[in-house]
Structures are given as structure tokens and as C-alpha cells.
A protein has these predicted regions:
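C-terminal interaction segment
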Residues: 1-60, 65-124
Length: 124
């Protein structure tokens, strides 16, 4: 993913593009128009993902939704842009919660997101 305003490349864990991808340069390796970006947080990247990286992503005109998934517990942060340009925040913290996307018609329970995750394993 290329962000021309900051002259910055990054590789999100997941991204969703609406309609046709727009590419940087003549190749077809690097897109510039992510609608939704999902990052799985680790202890080493979580602060960066929440601050500078989110700032870089917000420079993409098509970007409307940012999902941060904690890998150590049931916890998902959702940021989405309203029509007036303001960003709203929602946190889901229970295995009974459902993540409902605002930019596309899709939802997924946290139980499904965290399926087969063993929270008792320690980070190495």
C-alpha cells in the first residue's frame, strides 16, 4: 500500500478495496486506494499501528475504516469515518460481541475472528 502524501509504503495484514484497485506507478504490485485496513496488534507494533500508521492511512482519500485486532485477548478496536469526515471509535471486548463493518455489508462475531486462538500460550 502506497501513501503518496507521506511517500510511504506499508503492508497491512488485510485490506479491502472497493471497485477497481488503483496502482502506484506502472506495475500492479502496490495499490493506493484501500477502503478498509485491518491490523493484528502485537506488543512490538501496537503503539505504531494506533498512532503514526493510522495517520498515514488517513491520508488515503478512499480509506474509511480501520480495524485493530488484539492477538492476546478478545479485543477489537474499530475506527470509521463519518460523512462529515470525523472518525468514530468503537471497542468490542467480549466473545459475545459482533464486529459490524460500516463501509461494507459484513459482520463477524469475535468468536469467529478468534476461532482456534489459545490465549493461554505465551508470546515468545
Amino acid at each position: 500500500l502506497w501513501m503518496p502524501r507521506y511517500r510511504f509504503y506499508t503492508y497491512p495484514d488485510v485490506m479491502v478495496i472497493k471497485d477497481k484497485p488503483l496502482y502506484e506507478g506502472k506495475g500492479t504490485n502496490t495499490v493506493t486506494n484501500a477502503l478498509i485496513i485491518v491490523e493484528v496488534l502485537s506488543k512490538s507494533t501496537r503503539d505504531y499501528d494506533r498512532t503514526d500508521k493510522f495517520k498515514f492511512y488517513r491520508s488515503i482519500p478512499e480509506f474509511k475504516e480501520y480495524i485493530l485486532i488484539d492477538q492476546y485477548r478478545y479485543y477489537v478496536e474499530q475506527f470509521y469515518q463519518q460523512n462529515n469526515g470525523e472518525w468514530l471509535f468503537k471497542a468490542s471486548e467480549s466473545d459475545k460481541d459482533t464486529l459490524r463493518f460500516n463501509s461494507v455489508d459484513f459482520q463477524m462475531s469475535l468468536l469467529d475472528i478468534y476461532q482456534r486462538i489459545d490465549f493461554n500460550l505465551t508470546e515468545e
